[in-house]
Regions:
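Alpha/beta catalytic cores of group-transfer enzymes, especially the acyltransferase/condensing modules
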Residues: 124-141
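ATP-binding N-lobe of GHMP and related small-molecule kinases
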Residues: 1-104, 114-124, 135
């Protein structure tokens, strides 16, 4: 079983200036000041005894094909890492998962990628996780 724990964060200033639409058109670039909190998003990944995919969050999904998952961030992280069958993924948050402004969806995406890459036998570095999570989050919105 793989367990990943990713901190949530609070941004003090500069939110949005780290997006390409801003910093690519600005001669000053972008700068965000934020702080990680002692609250986390926990992700577990474990092998199933069949080829189905089970995802537990505020809901439970069990599908034969990961493409049928409703949870877009989980589905896209699975696609990117190549872990697409015979797996159980569970997410648990120390905070409410919507509307807190603490970057919980970003922390979830990083945690998913970290756990799934590790499950697949890879060791992603922080830059890879950040780039992949950013890509998933931007494409999802």
């Amino acid at each position: 079983m793989i367990i990943s724990r990713t901190p949530v964060r609070v941004s003090f200033c500069g939110g949005g200036t780290d997006l390409p639409a801003y910093y690519e058109g600005s001669e000053n670039g972008g700068l965000v000041t934020s702080l990680a909190l002692a609250k986390h998003i926990h992700v577990t990944v474990n092998k199933r005894f069949d080829n189905s995919v089970r995802v537990g969050y505020s809901q439970t999904e069990i599908v034969d094909d990961f493409e049928d998952l409703e949870h877009e961030l989980v589905r896209e992280a699975m696609r990117l890492t190549g872990v697409t069958d015979g797996v159980e993924i569970t997410t648990i948050a120390d905070i409410p998962s919507r509307g807190t402004g603490l970057g919980s969806s970003s922390a979830l995406t990083v945690g998913l990628l970290n756990a799934l890459h590790t499950y697949a036998g890879h060791t992603p570095d922080a830059a890879q996780l950040a780039e992949e999570a950013c890509r998933i989050e931007i494409e999802a919105n």
